[in-house]
Curated annotation (Swiss-Prot):
Function recorded in the entry: An aminoacyl-tRNA editing enzyme that deacylates mischarged D-aminoacyl-tRNAs. Also deacylates mischarged glycyl-tRNA(Ala), protecting cells against glycine mischarging by AlaRS. Acts via tRNA-based rather than protein-based catalysis; rejects L-amino acids rather than detecting D-amino acids in the active site. By recycling D-aminoacyl-tRNA to D-amino acids and free tRNA molecules, this enzyme counteracts the toxicity associated with the formation of D-aminoacyl-tRNA entities in vivo and helps enforce protein L-homochirality.
Gene transcribed to yield this protein: dtd
Pfam families: Tyr_Deacylase
RNA-binding keyword on record: yes
Protein name: D-aminoacyl-tRNA deacylase
Sequence motif: Gly-cisPro motif, important for rejection of L-amino acids, positions: 137-138
A biological process term (GO) from this entry: D-amino acid catabolic process
Organism, scientific name: Cellvibrio japonicus (strain Ueda107) (Pseudomonas fluorescens subsp. cellulosa)
Amino acid sequence: MLGLIQRVRRASVEVDQQVVGEIDQGMLLLLGIQKTDTEASADKLIDKLLAYRLFADADNRMNCNLQQVDGGILVVSQFTLAADTKKGLRPSFSSAAPPAQAQQLYDYFVTQLRSRHAKVATGIFAADMQVSLVNDGPVTFMLEMD
C-alpha cells in the first residue's frame, strides 16, 4: 500500500464540479493500492499516518502528529501511484490491485481510519476527481507498507 502524504493548510476534492470532500489544516493522502496489499497493510498505514510527525511544534520542529494538531485528513484514491515507470515511456499498472480488490481495501481503509480519527474526508473511488490544495511547506512524504 502506497501513501503520498502532503501537509496542507486546506484541501478539497471535486467530482462533476461538486465538492465531495474538504479539510482545513491537515494531511492530503493520495492512496495507491497494489495487488499484494491486505487489510493488514491498511492497518499498518493507518497506524503510521496517525503517528507520523509532520507538523511543527512550538520550536518549529516536525514533532507533532495529525491528532496532536487536531488536523483533518483527505483521502483520495490514486491507482497511478502503483505504476512501474522503470522501462519505456508508458507506465505499466501491472502491480496495481484490480478494481474490485482495490475498492474493498479502500473502503476498509476509510472505515478503519474513521473509527480512529474524527476528521476524515474522502474523494470518490475510481471517479475523475479534481484535487485542490494549499501545500504547507511544502512537506511531502511517500510511505510504503508491505
